[in-house]
Amino acid sequence: MNFVLSLIFLALILKGVQCEVHLVESGGGLVKPGGSLKLSCVVSGFTFNKYAMSWVRQTPEKRLEWVATISSGGLYTYYPDSVKGRFTISRDNAGNTLYLQMSSLRSEDTAMYYCAR
């Protein structure tokens, strides 16, 4: 969690046309156990409100873990038991932004967090 900002550039080939998708995460930092943190991910390069979005994390041991998913309209959210009741995923479709509010943080939540389509 000590990595403050990560930037992901993905190149997609859609129907023979190259398209650049940008996902820019921010809000990371060092937090003591029991603390809270809110991450955000600003998206461009695709129609944000047409896709479900997720947060995933990579642990210090390089293990990938699914953290949360939200439906395209924001009505439905899904979490693994490990974060249920502590993490809240949300989205602002007008602002093309995905959020992850994390509370009651534990040492096992230490990871690099990424938004994903």
From Swiss-Prot:
<dbReference type="InterPro" id="IPR036179">
    <property type="entry name" value="Ig-like_dom_sf"/>
</dbReference>
<feature type="signal peptide">
    <location>
        <begin position="1"/>
        <end position="19"/>
    </location>
</feature>
<feature type="region of interest" description="Complementarity-determining-2">
    <location>
        <begin position="69"/>
        <end position="85"/>
    </location>
</feature>
<feature type="region of interest" description="Complementarity-determining-1">
    <location>
        <begin position="50"/>
        <end position="54"/>
    </location>
</feature>
<feature type="disulfide bond">
    <location>
        <begin position="41"/>
        <end position="115"/>
    </location>
</feature>
<dbReference type="GO" id="GO:0005576">
    <property type="term" value="C:extracellular region"/>
</dbReference>
<dbReference type="GO" id="GO:0016064">
    <property type="term" value="P:immunoglobulin mediated immune response"/>
</dbReference>
<dbReference type="GO" id="GO:0003823">
    <property type="term" value="F:antigen binding"/>
</dbReference>
<dbReference type="InterPro" id="IPR050199">
    <property type="entry name" value="IgHV"/>
</dbReference>
<keyword id="KW-0732">Signal</keyword>
<keyword id="KW-1280">Immunoglobulin</keyword>
<keyword id="KW-1064">Adaptive immunity</keyword>
<dbReference type="InterPro" id="IPR013106">
    <property type="entry name" value="Ig_V-set"/>
</dbReference>
<dbReference type="InterPro" id="IPR013783">
    <property type="entry name" value="Ig-like_fold"/>
</dbReference>
<dbReference type="InterPro" id="IPR007110">
    <property type="entry name" value="Ig-like_dom"/>
</dbReference>
<dbReference type="GO" id="GO:0019814">
    <property type="term" value="C:immunoglobulin complex"/>
</dbReference>
<protein>
    <recommendedName>
        <fullName>Ig heavy chain V region 5-76</fullName>
    </recommendedName>
</protein>
<keyword id="KW-0391">Immunity</keyword>
<feature type="region of interest" description="Framework-1">
    <location>
        <begin position="20"/>
        <end position="49"/>
    </location>
</feature>
<feature type="region of interest" description="Framework-2">
    <location>
        <begin position="55"/>
        <end position="68"/>
    </location>
</feature>
<keyword id="KW-1015">Disulfide bond</keyword>
<dbReference type="Pfam" id="PF07686">
    <property type="entry name" value="V-set"/>
</dbReference>
<feature type="region of interest" description="Framework-3">
    <location>
        <begin position="86"/>
        <end position="117"/>
    </location>
</feature>
